[in-house]
């Protein structure tokens, strides 16, 4: 018996994004295979225009693919539709979006909150 799961990107049930213990205003997510205990898995996040993420450090790898819109990293790099981005363990950053975006994320470890610079 197959244990296949098909996720229809145009028909998702988004919930408030609460990975860091508090909800980030303007950010929601749809968990595909994400496990909050291990911080491993896949999810799709939606950021409304003007949304800012919480500064954090990557304890494991995180990769994401921009499905729609664009995301601006704390160093000014702009990630656009079609970009696949890899953050290695030890990376510290935060991001924001002016236009909004939809992101497919692959997590392999915890992100820990850090204080803003």
PLM regions with names:
Residues 73-92:
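Short acidic-glycine-tyrosine-enriched beta hairpin
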Residues 57-59, 77-78, 97-99:
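Short glycine/proline-enriched turns and hinge-like loops at secondary-structure junctions
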Residues 89-114:
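Ligand-binding loop in jelly-roll beta-barrel domains
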Residues 58-74:
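Glycine- and acidic-residue-biased ligand/ion/polar-headgroup-sensing regions
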Residues 1-38:
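A short, N-terminal "cap"/entry segment at the start of jelly-roll beta-barrel domains
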Residues 28-58, 88-92:
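Conserved short histidine dyad/triad with adjacent acidic residue
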